[in-house]
Structures are given as C-alpha cells and as structure tokens.
Regions:
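Charged, amphipathic alpha-helical segments
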Residues: 12-13, 97-107, 132-169, 519-521
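Beta-strand-rich solenoidal segments
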Residues: 140-224, 228
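Structured, hydrophobic secondary-structure cores that serve as assembly/anchoring elements
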Residues: 1-104, 108-116, 122-127, 171-175, ...
Length: 569
C-alpha cells in the first residue's frame, strides 16, 4: 500500500484464490475440400446439421472431407474446420459474370469490397467461392408502381409495395425502400429449382437509414449482416442509381431502377471450384499453427497426401506441442494384395518414418452410407479415431486409452477395407500403426493405442501423450498468474499450492500414480532470479494402459492345497 501522509483508513484486496483452470482437450481440427463456405478461415462446427449449413452437402469431390468431419461429430461436438481453395482456379460467382474474382471469406470482403463500388463484379457476388454460387439469382424491386409490382414474380413474398421509410421521411427524403429476393435458380442448394432462399423486405437505399430497433437498414448492411448466400458489391443499374443510392437520407428523393415495368434481376455466374492441390490444403492447415490464436487438440487429416500429413505433424503438432495429429494410409494401401506390408511401407517411406508422440496412425478405411447422395463411400478412419479420443474425454478423461471394447467402438461401419489378422496386427503394431478390427459379436474396434514415436518411451502411448498435454495446458495457464510477480518464497509457495491440489485430483482420477512439485530455492537459484526467470519442476508417474494379457490356467490334483502351487508355475 502507498504511504499515508495523514490519519485515515485505506482498504485493499489481495486475491490468493488462483487455481489451475480447465484446459480443453476435445476440440477437433480439419482442413479440406468443400463446395461452399468461407475459405482459409476457421469455423466452429458443433454438429453435422451445422456442417451442412456452413459447408453444404457432399459431392464426389468433397465427400471424404465432409464425412471425416461428420464422423468426428458423431463422437464429439466441437470442431474447427478450414476450407481449402486454389488461388488461381477457384472463383467467386458474380453478377457481371467476371471470372477473375476470388473472395475467400468475410474478412477479405469487408477489407476489400464492403466500402467501395467495384463496378466489375456487378451488384452482387456469391458469399463464398465455388461453382455452387452459379445457382443463385437476385431480384430487386425498387419502385412504387403498384401495377407493375403486382406482376413481379416474387410479389407474394412481401406484405406491400416498397415506398418511403419512416426514418427517411423524417429526414425529408422519399422513395428509399426496396425489396430483395435471393433465389436458388438451379436448385443446387435446396434441391428444387426456383426456391426462394432469402427475402429482405423494406430495406433502404439511404446509407444512414435505421430500422425500428436502431440497426442499419441500408440494404448493403442488411445483406452483409444477414445473408448466407450473397454480398453486395455495387448498386444495381449503376448508371442511373449511383447519384442517390448509398447517400444519406436528408432531403433525398431516391432514384428508381429506370425500367419501372420490371425488377432488376440477375443470375450469378463464373463461379468455379478449382483444382485443390496439396499446397492449398497445407495453406488451410496453417490456420491451426498459432496456439495463441486458436485452441485445438485433435487434428484430422482425412485423405490428405503424405506431404500434407507430414506438414500437419511437423508444422502444427510438433510446433504447438498441445495437440495430436491423426493420419490414415492411402486407400490403395489397404485394398492391395499385401495390405500390411503396404501400410508399413507408407508409414516408413511416404511418411518418412516420422517419429513423433504427437501423431497417431490407424490401419485403414471404412465403407459407410452417404445419405445425401444415396450411395456408399470409402472414408478414412482418422476422423473416427480422433472422435474416439473426444468421446473418451467426455466419458472419462484424456488420460484413458481410446482403444478397446470399453471406449474404442467405431460407428457407422458397413465394412472395413482391410481386416488385419493376428499376424498382420503384430506387423502393424510394432511399426506404430494401430489396427482397426472387427470381432464377431463385438463390432468394429480400435485395437491399439500407440503414437508414432519410434523409440521406447511412456510417450509411445496415446493416453500418456494426452495426459501430458492436459497437464501442460492446464498448469501453464495457471502459471501465467505468476508472471511479473517477485520470484521469492511467497510466490513459489503459492505456485506449489496451486499445482498440488490439481495433481491430487488427476491422481484420484487415475491419470497418475504419484507426483512431486519442486519450486523453491533449489531450482530458483540467485542466478535464475537475476535472469528474471521462474522454474517449477513437476514430476509425475503416468498410469499405463494394458496392452498385453496373459492368462495361466493350471490343473491341480485333488487333495493338493492351492497354497502349495500358487506362484510356483
């Protein structure tokens, strides 16, 4: 407290209630190919319904990406998804048909297109890049001729003809209102041609117009705020409307679209999916690199090629050290005549025999039903294995193994591309590949819990790696409270008193068998203190999952006491 110069009472508070916070370990991450949705921007997806809403239904080009995500979401409910696009060949559909535009996401639109008339795109662009945007049509009614309004194809979607809003009327203006309709012209979004997707009644041409609750009613802002399908890029019929449209309301009589006998209707075109290559997918995965910006724990790779899988392992997991990457072999490896050898060769050659406790590899692909296209598809299992980890976190804790009959049951399996027999399982497992198997009466199971770490270590098991991720994330967050404090006995004691109760809880929940926290003058020497450093050493003995069971059945003669033979066989 400050020194007092005269008598008085000063009240102060000291907060010593710091605890180790909960650390998320169930958040999935994926980057891949989709028909729709923001590109190179992570979106949170909570369910398959939300996945369809944001990234649309799968087709033949996007099915593996879609179902990798959908499969994870059958086990967990927190997924970050990034869409990959090709900067050269992927294009955004425009009202003008100009095929040179790629507006990747909301951030790019707001920075480059929101505030200025572009001219070359026409009045509207699809909200997201891809050929799906070519299915969109926009119709605008912006005049007060009742007879002509009654003949407008979309008249019945509105209560009345547009006129003058109360806001503009109060400002001495007139004729600012307009109606906008967004139509699925080709039926690619809704399944039915001509379906009206969105309507925007009585929006304003005045840039400062407000609605009844004080939000902007300027039609550009309303479309930006509410539409799932389009962005504004210019005023319709710019030659005749630019003088008044987009100006303030005071004293303005806003221009009609000149041809009062018709609405201003335009179909978007020139959208293209492009050819997505490995580098594009890696660019999408790069959005997960910074642990300070985005928190993820379970990174799936779908059917990504080996270069992309290695990028995810080396540039994301090994860099962040707070997440695990899940990979599968190529479909060709598990449908060959020698699948065990081919999967191991993929592990050793294509994946460069990478050694990392932050990576997990499974043995194959599954056959599952695609309800959106009424067909069956082969899908890699890494989305399911990551999902099993998420489900394990929810039902128990991250330090439990996700494998086996209790927690390793794989969902939505018609059949496996490869059923590894015992000899094959031995070959796969000693090379760090976790077999996925089917047993009669038990279903399809993840039957291994190894990481891709090559050397013998506690960290060559998934549960131990994820235990340490959980401990490190939680305790490091608690340690931030010690930043800029003094490195003295009080601060060290406070740190120990924060960490030890947390570790006792983990021990009680079977994550560790014992622990010790050292944070005193023995490791915070005067030299450490003078370097403005603070050291806490945390020793733990992790619990180990059972991988091998031996059952000994011993026949004993009648009249022989069991005490005589127990321990001697």
């Amino acid at each position: 407290m400050a020194f007092q110069l005269s008598p008085g009472v000063v009240t102060s508070e000291v907060d010593l209630t710091t605890v180790v916070p909960a650390a998320g370990t169930t958040t999935g991450a994926f980057a891949g190919i989709f028909q729709w949705g923001p590109a190179e921007l992570a979106r949170q997806i909570e369910s398959e319904v939300r996945l369809v809403e944001v990234f649309q239904k799968p087709d033949n080009n996007t099915a593996v990406s879609f179902f990798t995500c959908a499969n994870f979401l059958t086990y967990g409910n927190d997924l970050r998804v990034v869409r990959a696009v090709n900067g050269v060949s992927t294009r955004t559909a425009t009202a003008s048909g100009n095929n040179t535009y790629l507006i990747k996401n909301e951030d790019q639109y707001f920075t480059s297109y929101y505030g200025a008339n572009t001219g070359n795109t026409g009045a509207w662009v699809a909200r997201y890049p891809g050929a799906l945007g070519n299915s969109l049509k926009v119709s605008v009614w912006a005049n007060t001729n009742q007879t002509h309004f009654d003949a407008w194809a979309y008249k019945n979607y509105f209560d009345a003809i547009p006129g003058t809003s109360s806001y503009v009327s109060a400002a001495g203006g007139a004729n600012d209102e307009m109606h906008i309709v967004v139509v699925d012209e080709d039926g690619l979004f809704s399944g039915t041609t001509g379906t009206v997707l969105e309507t925007y009644p009585f929006v304003s041409k005045a840039s400062d117009a407000k609605d009844s609750v004080g939000n902007s009613n300027y039609y550009r802002d309303v479309i930006w705020r509410k539409s799932k399908y389009i962005y504004w890029t210019d005023h319709p019929d710019i030659t005749n409307t630019y003088v008044t449209w987009g100006t303030t309301a005071a004293g303005k009589s806003f221009a009609h679209v000149p041809n009062v006998a018709a609405a201003h209707t335009v179909s978007l075109s020139s959208g293209a999916d492009g050819t997505i290559v490995s580098g594009n997918v890696q660019t999408a995965y790069s959005k997960f690199i910074d642990a300070d910006l985005i928190d993820v724990s379970l990174v799936m790779t779908g059917d990504a090629d080996s270069a992309t899988a290695l990028y995810a392992i080396n540039s994301i997991a090994e860099s962040r050290k707070d997440c695990v990457v899940f990979v599968s072999p190529a479909l060709a490896n598990v449908t060959s005549a020698t699948p065990a050898d081919d999967v191991v060769n993929y592990r050793k050659n294509a994946l460069s025999n990478v050694s990392s406790s932050y990576a997990v590899m499974d043995s194959g692909w599954k056959y599952q039903y695609d309800k959106y296209n009424d067909k069956y598809r082969w899908i890699p299992l890494n989305g399911d294995v990551a999902g099993l980890c998420a489900r394990t976190d929810t039902e128990t804790d991250p330090w439990f193994s996700p494998a086996g009959a209790s927690r390793g049951s794989v969902k939505n399996v018609i059949k496996l591309a490869y059923y590894p027999a015992k000899a094959d399982r031995d070959t796969l497992y000693k090379n760090g590949v976790n077999p996925v198997v089917s047993f009669a009466g038990e279903g399809t199971l993840l039957f291994g819990d190894k990481t891709m770490l090559s050397k013998p270590s506690a960290f060559d098991r998934i549960n131990v790696r994820r235990l340490f991720i959980a401990l490190e994330k939680a305790i490091s967050r608690a340690a931030k409270a010690q930043l800029f404090e003094f490195n003295d006995e009080f601060t060290r004691s406070q740190f120990v008193s924060i960490v030890e109760p947390f570790l006792r809880t983990v021990k009680g929940r079977r994550g560790i068998t014992d622990f010790k926290v050292v944070c005193d003058a023995s490791n915070n020497t005067p030299d450490v203190v003078d370097r403005n450093e603070f050291i806490g050493d945390i020793y733990v003995k992790p619990n180990r999952s059972i991988n091998f069971i031996q059952l000994n059945f011993v026949a004993v003669r009648s009249g022989v006491s069991f005490d005589e033979v127990v321990g001697r066989t």
